[in-house]
């Protein structure tokens, strides 16, 4: 659809489809179609053209149905070889190559065209298609993709609609290329040996000249690829002048686009040795703990041992996936040499970028606008980037803010590209406290920067005015500029909405260049339909993007995560377009980095330990987990396909070989994997037009099997022929047989609320349903199929976002993550028992198990944190009096724990402050959010009591630096950790009082108990500071609840006192008789 042509809204279920045009705008006049004597091709909409004799080209001699020569030749070679109107088989015309089934011809005046496909400007499979004013040459590589496409729709192109109806250009080569796809069979003509070979043109002078020309071209090509195998050269190739430079460029272009940078062995080997030693020490430690119970405090001892065993298992699940950490390095210059050479059409893959937002009051439109602006200004060919914004709250505020953003982008994007600034989100660029004149050499930069800053400030004022206007909702609902009622006034009951703001025919920037396509999408919502929150919105974006642009790769970001590096897409393509990695890589995950966090990162918002240690460790196994944002996907992986694995990938790993020995027969899992690969190859076979099947087209012997294949695809992907056709375009781009006029209705259809019914969406395809943390589940399903993922961590962070620095918001965020993990733990997709028939590696499975079981650690953790207070109150302890031999185990255990942590910091580069903050928040979250998540998850799964999904507030600091850090917001999550703090403080006072009253001999055991209790309080210290706030004042409600719970607990303990026997109680009360 044309940009700025108006919003499209509708519902497939209600048979509604309307176009709401901007106020005062009239429908744009249609461009006059190119024609010759009124003849326009009814397949592609191009000129029919003329024949070799100068007459109008007539493809069908029976009905003269207007078809141009390129479409005629394509139908003969790749299609059904019949006229679309009368179904008469096409005959060969002079100048066209022969295809199988053509009648024998005695005349030999056209043998060149009869036997061979011409290159360059010739007509044939590498014909030139004139489209939108430019020539595009389809190579055999792109034809190889086309012949797999189901020809489900056809029609004439409508001016002003989606222009890229041809396969995306990154699969198109220039006409001078002699590239031939080896997977495409060469046309063969059967030669009758009884005839003279000269009659076929063989051994003639022309034939010999063609053979000589072919050999010369092959020799030239061999010279170009000679540098690929340097060991095969007899000596160094001495190239001088431009020829030598060209050879060097070709050699550089064939080098890998990335490489693995291993951790230095002197760091990694010592780290592994300490892990093994720690495991051995743990075995001796538990042997001592189990065989030496505390007789007078058996309950305390038993609880402590159970907790310690669980902590050890948790450590194993967390530690071993970090066994083989790696770093990666990309080469953007090699990517440019191979796919994006200057002066040549870019061969980079098309990418669709998804931005998701729900509530503009919690996710300010200005933040979303900055994210969109950073995407539109990215360093990537504009015709290869499309930005889709999902508004799942159907807010008119988001729509109007996006309209203002599109207008400001016309000025902002050329400014960014002209002066090469970073980052390209204006709010964060102008807020940088750096020397912005560094490395700037253009005298006009200062003046233009000052003018652009003023433009941005005016843009902010307009956005703020929209936000202020949205605070008061009219009683009759919102209305658009032309007086039409806003279709999304009811966020739970509204039609689907689509608006294209930028892109083709959407206007140019201030420098006269095109901008990337910007599309607003709000999926249909109706009562009685399950919408699956963010996962459902992302799946709707997959489908609508496949219909409109169909980028080969997808990148999703949250609305508050802007592009901090304009090279982010190129960084991802260094892996996705690498011949060795791309075919088996499902996604490239980038680390999350944040702005606006306090200097000391009180609540571990940066999560450095996870992103810089755990994720690097997973990258050395099967790849990092998907974290929900900043991730570039292979579209085929989201469609549920298996990866293209090599024989080496399918071989049993070295552990299996060493344990089981060599085997002559292939393992069952190996054969199953090969069978799945074969099934995937078969599923890529062409799917044909249903109408053609019904009419009995020649060449298909089993029509029923084709029909069943079509029904299987509809059951899998839904009933959208255009979308199904797009799934076969593995290199991206719109199927050439698609009618652009039908794209609007089809886009509305695929985002309708009932489209996913009785399909595999959310089960095997797209983002997987069943958890509020759909990211973990989606990545797990891909890894279980055998895909690998890549962790890309360039020196400059590619994405930055905002994090909740307020204590209550942070705990609510952690609660949502933990609740999602509990839901997965109690589902059929639990990594403990799911996916054993797939290709998921053992250590990768351990990492996923750790990801879903960590909330359960909150139960033993909170029990262990209360134990010090109980010991101080009862004058008991969890450990008996130990000898020097037993004390050695405790010393070695603590030493191994610290050694492991220090060595991790050494090879990862993480600071000790970040490590300590992570340890502190592990206790804070474990005693609050994780504990609540366990019980809420049980209620949701077992009792069906659902909890509300709350969007984390992303409002900016407007009252000063880190003002939000000191704001207190009441939540029940604060009660458990506050209770633990009060109990430990009370226990310390009671223990010290008891030691003072009992004399000197009580101080020795007291120190161990006090150290235990102080250790708990130190971990909860950031939480205590958060309770105090800026005024060092804790809310009364928290104090009352915590003291009440602590008092009740203490009184009950004194009353029950489970460690005193009935006889001792009787003695204490003076009730003992003579038999005592």
From Swiss-Prot:
Superkingdom as given in the UniProt entry: Eukaryota
Active site: 392, 775
Binding site for Zn(2+) 1: 41, 44, 68, 71
Topological region Extracellular: 289-296, 873-884, 942-971, 1025-1033
GO molecular function terms noted in the UniProt entry: cellulose synthase (UDP-forming) activity; cellulose synthase activity; zinc ion binding
Protein name: Probable cellulose synthase A catalytic subunit 1 [UDP-forming]
Zinc finger (RING-type): 41-87
Entry's Gene Ontology BP terms: cell wall organization; cellulose biosynthetic process; plant-type primary cell wall biogenesis
Family the UniProt entry places it in: Belongs to the glycosyltransferase 2 family. Plant cellulose synthase subfamily.
Any Pfam family: Cellulose_synt
Keywords: Cell membrane, Cell wall biogenesis/degradation, Cellulose biosynthesis, Coiled coil, Glycoprotein, Glycosyltransferase, Manganese, Membrane, Metal-binding, Transferase, Transmembrane, Transmembrane helix, Zinc, Zinc-finger
The protein's role, per its UniProt record: Probable catalytic subunit of cellulose synthase terminal complexes ('rosettes'), required for beta-1,4-glucan microfibril crystallization, a major mechanism of the cell wall formation.
Keyword Ribosomal protein appears in the UniProt entry: no
Main location: membrane
Cofactor binding summary note: Binds 2 Zn(2+) ions per subunit.
């Amino acid at each position: 659809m044309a940009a700025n042509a108006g919003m499209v809204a509708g519902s497939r279920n209600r048979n509604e489809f309307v176009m709401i045009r901007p106020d005062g705008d009239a429908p744009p006049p249609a461009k006059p179609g190119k024609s010759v004597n009124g003849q326009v091709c009814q397949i592609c909409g191009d000129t029919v053209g003329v024949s070799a004799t100068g007459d109008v080209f007539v493809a069908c001699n029976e009905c003269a149905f207007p078809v141009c020569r390129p479409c005629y030749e394509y139908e003969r070679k790749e299609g059904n070889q019949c006229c679309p109107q009368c179904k008469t088989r096409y005959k060969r015309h002079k100048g066209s190559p022969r295809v199988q089934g053509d009648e024998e011809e005695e005349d030999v005046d056209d043998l060149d065209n009869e036997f061979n496909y011409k290159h360059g400007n010739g007509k044939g499979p590498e014909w030139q298609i004139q489209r939108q004013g430019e020539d595009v040459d389809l190579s055999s590589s792109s034809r190889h993709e086309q012949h797999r496409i189901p020809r489900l729709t056809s029609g004439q192109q409508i001016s002003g609609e989606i222009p890229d109806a041809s396969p995306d250009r990154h699969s198109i080569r220039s006409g001078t290329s002699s590239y031939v796809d080896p997977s495409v069979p060469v046309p063969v003509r059967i030669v009758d040996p009884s005839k003279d070979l000269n009659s076929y043109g063989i051994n003639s002078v022309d034939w010999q000249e063609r053979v000589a020309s072919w050999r010369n071209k092959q020799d030239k090509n061999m010279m170009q690829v000679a540098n690929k195998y340097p060991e095969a050269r007899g000596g160094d190739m001495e190239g001088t002048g431009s020829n030598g430079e060209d050879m060097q460029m070709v050699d550089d272009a064939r080098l890998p686009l990335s490489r693995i940078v291993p951790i230095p062995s002197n760091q990694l080997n010592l780290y592994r040795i300490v892990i093994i030693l720690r495991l051995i020490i743990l075995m001796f430690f538990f042997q001592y703990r189990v065989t030496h119970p505390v007789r007078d405090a058996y309950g305390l001892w038993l609880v402590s041992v159970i907790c310690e065993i669980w902590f050890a298992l948790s450590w194993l699940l967390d530690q071993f996936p970090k066994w083989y950490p790696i770093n990666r390095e990309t080469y953007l210059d090699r990517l440019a040499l191979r796919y994006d050479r200057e002066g040549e059409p870019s061969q980079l893959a098309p990418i669709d970028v998804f931005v998701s937002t729900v509530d503009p009051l919690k996710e300010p439109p200005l933040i979303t606008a900055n994210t969109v602006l950073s995407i539109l200004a990215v360093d990537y060919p504009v015709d290869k980037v499309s930005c889709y914004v999902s508004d799942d709250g159907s807010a008119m505020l988001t729509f109007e803010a996006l309209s203002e953003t599109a207008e400001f982008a016309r000025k902002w994007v050329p400014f960014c590209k002209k002066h090469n600034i970073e980052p390209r989100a204006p709010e964060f660029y102008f807020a940088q406290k750096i020397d912005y004149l560094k490395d700037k050499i253009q005298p006009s930069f200062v003046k233009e920067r000052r003018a652009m800053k003023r433009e941005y400030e005016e843009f902010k004022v307009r956005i703020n005015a929209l936000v202020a206007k949205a605070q008061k909702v009219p009683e009759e609902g919102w209305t658009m500029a032309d007086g039409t009622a806003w279709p999304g006034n009811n966020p739970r009951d509204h039609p689907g909405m689509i608006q294209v703001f930028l892109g083709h025919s959407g206007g140019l920037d201030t420098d006269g260049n095109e901008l990337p396509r910007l599309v607003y999408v709000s999926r249909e919502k109706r009562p009685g339909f399950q919408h699956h929150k963010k996962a459902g919105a992302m799946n709707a974006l997959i489908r609508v993007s496949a219909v409109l642009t169909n980028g080969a790769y997808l990148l999703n970001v949250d609305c508050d995560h802007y592009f901090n590096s304009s090279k982010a897409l190129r960084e991802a393509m260094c892996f996705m377009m690498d011949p060795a990695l791309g075919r088996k890589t499902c996604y490239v995950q980038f680390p999350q980095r944040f702005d606006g966090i306090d200097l000391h990162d009180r609540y571990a918002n940066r999560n450095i330990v996870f992103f810089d240690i755990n994720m690097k460790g997973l990258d050395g196994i099967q790849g990092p987990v998907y974290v929900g944002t900043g991730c570039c996907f292979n579209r085929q992986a989201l469609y549920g396909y298996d990866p293209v694995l090599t024989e080496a990938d399918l071989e049993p790993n070295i552990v299996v070989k060493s344990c089981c020995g060599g085997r002559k027969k292939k393992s069952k899992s190996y054969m199953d994997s090969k069978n799945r690969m074969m099934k995937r190859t078969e599923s890529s076979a062409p799917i044909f037009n249903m109408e053609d099947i019904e009419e009995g087209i020649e060449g298909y012997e089993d029509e029923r099997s084709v029909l069943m294949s079509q029904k299987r695809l509809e059951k899998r992907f839904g009933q959208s022929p255009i979308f199904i056709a797009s799934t076969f375009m593995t290199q991206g781009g719109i199927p050439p047989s698609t009618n652009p006029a039908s794209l609007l209705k089809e886009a509305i259809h695929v985002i309708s609320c009932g489209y996913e019914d009785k399909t595999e969406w959310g089960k095997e395809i797209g983002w997987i349903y069943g958890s509020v943390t759909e990211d973990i589940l989606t990545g797990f399903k891909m890894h279980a199929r055998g895909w690998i993922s890549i962790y890309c961590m360039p020196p400059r962070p590619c994405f930055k976002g905002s994090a909740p620095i307020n204590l209550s918001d942070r705990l609510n965020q952690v609660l949502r993550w933990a609740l999602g993990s509990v839901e997965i733990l109690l589902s059929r997709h639990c990594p403990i028992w799911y996916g054993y028939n797939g290709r998921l590696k053992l250590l990768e499975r351990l990492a996923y198990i750790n990801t879903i079981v960590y909330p359960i650690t909150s139960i033993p953790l909170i029990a262990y944190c209360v134990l010090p207070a109980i010991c101080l109150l009862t004058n008991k302890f969890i450990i008996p009096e130990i000898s020097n031999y037993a004390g050695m185990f405790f010393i070695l255990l603590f030493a191994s724990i610290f050694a492991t942590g220090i060595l991790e910091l050494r090879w990862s580069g993480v600071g000790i402050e970040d490590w300590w903050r992570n340890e502190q928040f592990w206790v804070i979250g474990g005693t609050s959010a994780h504990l609540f998540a366990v019980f809420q998850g049980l209620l949701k799964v077992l009792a069906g009591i659902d909890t509300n999904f709350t969007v984390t507030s992303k409002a900016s600091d407007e009252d000063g630096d880190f003002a939000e850090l000191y704001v207190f917001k009441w939540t029940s999550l604060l009660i458990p950790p506050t209770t633990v703090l009060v109990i430990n403080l009370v226990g310390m006072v009671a223990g010290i009082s008891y030691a003072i009253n009992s004399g000197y001999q009580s101080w020795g055991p007291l120190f161990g108990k006090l150290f235990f209790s102080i250790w708990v309080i130190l971990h909860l210290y950031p939480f205590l500071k958060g309770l105090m706030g800026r005024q060092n004042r804790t809310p009364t409600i928290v104090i009352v609840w915590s003291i009440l719970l602590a008092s009740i607990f203490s009184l009950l303990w004194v009353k029950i006192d489970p460690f005193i026997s009935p006889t001792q109680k009787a003695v204490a009360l003076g009730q003992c008789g003579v038999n005592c």
